[in-house]
From Swiss-Prot:
Composition bias, Polar residues: 1-10
Gene source species: Aspergillus fumigatus (strain CBS 144.89 / FGSC A1163 / CEA10)
InterPro entries named in the record: Golgi_membrane_TVP38/TMEM64, VTT_dom
Protein's recorded name: Golgi apparatus membrane protein tvp38
Cytoplasmic side: 103-119, 181-234, 295-418
Keyword presence, Lipoprotein: no
Lumenal side: 1-81, 141-157, 256-273
């Protein structure tokens, strides 16, 4: 019997080896369905795996958004829920009304377009309209661009649209920064994602700003949102807007094609109509695809720069922690330093540091409770690091004995002698 136990224990202690490949003879004896299952696993195409991964990402994002929406909805009071429903219905009605109005406006402009084309007053009024819709939360920027092309043609309409856009976005940036200054400071100190995005503009700010301006984002809202980034200056934002003005040729071109179709509808052949309609559809498709592509690239670049900034901050924290020195400022620019400090706090939590100069964790035991351990882990009660050497002013715990019975912590059990 002992021999059997020994052999069994030895067999159980052996590591589990992976399944060996079967010989051709053994492979023939396998069931047919086993061959089919293995062949399906081995022949899974990369496109199927990629589509499955993309589908999983979409499902995960939708699940997270739904969970976040439910969580926010539960926090709302009864009247807040009624207000949220009313605001959603109002937004839908305004959107539908705006779409209907946009479709009708070109029919109204048809009879007067030729007259307004020669009027500088109409030019100035339309320029002011484009200028003022740059301020959040006004809408209609794209519509006014199409109207500019409809009335003045592609090139003159583009000049009107581009100049009003550059000046309007710059003024909107300055006004929004002045009004939202307190909001900016609060976001910089509390929101690590906001601080990370602000720091990414420190590296290739102009390039990233141009990419943001090319993204299909709400125009006036984008002006107000970018103004909250303290690392972006008004002149830089105006320059980035000026560099992407060739994008504004798209709505101006669409407006000019719509006017040609409306004025020469009866004179044009079916082929000419098809060419103009296809050119409009193609231009819209190119604009949508370009905006989507640049939006994806912008997000990827922002994540890359954020990872780089976090890595630099992490190395700096670890170096100062190893040298037992407090960490200084990250930058001479106060706005950049505030954003970096916010990220540094987040990196401290990830690394496990409690403070810039906190090198040890002390366990505080409450003598009054006798057996309870205080959860407070602080360096203020034990400012000095641990050491084994004693000076004349320190007491030796082994020389003093166990002390009074009220301060003894018994970690053993008493065994009664039988």
């Amino acid at each position: 019997m002992p021999a059997d136990y020994t052999s069994t224990a030895r067999a159980l202690s052996l590591p589990m080896s992976p399944a060996e490949s079967l010989s051709p003879a053994e492979e023939d004896t396998r069931p047919l369905w086993s061959h089919l299952a293995s062949s399906r696993r081995n022949t899974a195409s990369p496109s199927v795996r990629e589509s499955t991964g993309l589908r999983d990402q979409v499902v995960n994002q939708a699940t997270k958004m739904l969970r976040r929406t439910k969580k926010t909805w539960r926090r709302l009071t009864f009247w807040q829920r009624i207000g949220a429903i009313g605001a959603a219905l109002l937004a839908i009605l305004l959107g539908l009304s705006f779409m209907i109005f946009t479709g009708q406006v070109f029919f109204w402009l048809g009879p007067v377009a030729e007259k307004w084309e020669q009027s500088w007053l109409a030019f100035f009024v339309l320029w002011l309209c484009v200028f003022f819709v740059s301020f959040p939360p006004l809408v209609g920027w794209s519509t006014f661009g199409t109207i500019s092309g409809f009335i003045y043609g592609i090139w003159k309409g583009w000049i009107l649209y581009a100049t009003a856009t550059v000046l309007g976005s710059t003024c909107s940036f300055i006004v929004s920064r002045t009004i939202l200054s307190k909001f900016v400071n609060r976001m910089m100190e509390r929101d690590k994602r906001f601080a990370a995005l602000a720091l990414t503009l420190k590296y290739d700010g102009l390039k990233l700003l141009c990419m943001i301006r090319l993204c299909p984002l709400p125009y006036s809202v984008c002006n107000g949102a970018v103004s909250t980034f303290p690392t972006v200056h008004p002149l830089m934002y105006g320059l980035a807007t000026a560099l992407i003005t060739p994008k504004l040729l798209v709505p101006a071109f669409i407006g000019s094609r719509i006017r040609i179709l409306s004025e020469k509808n009866e004179e044009m052949s079916a082929a000419s109509k098809a060419v103009n309609i296809c050119s409009i559809i193609l231009t819209i498709g190119i604009g949508v695809f370009t905006g989507w592509y640049i939006y994806r690239r912008t997000l990827a670049r922002a994540k890359e720069l954020e990872a780089k900034e976090r890595a630099d901050i992490r190395r700096s924290l670890q170096a100062d922690h190893a040298a037992h020195r407090p960490h200084g400022s990250f930058s001479e620019d106060p706005d950049v330093n505030t954003a970096a400090t916010t990220l540094a706090r987040d990196e401290e939590e990830r690394i496990g540091f409690n403070d810039f100069d906190d090198d040890n964790v002390d366990l505080v035991i409450d003598d009054d409770s006798g057996s309870e351990i205080s959860p407070n882990l602080t360096k203020k009660q034990f400012p000095g690091p641990y050491r084994d050497e004693f000076t004349d002013n320190d007491s030796d715990v082994f020389g003093d004995g166990d002390g009074p019975d009220s301060q003894m912590f018994r970690l053993h059990t008493h065994v009664r002698s039988g």
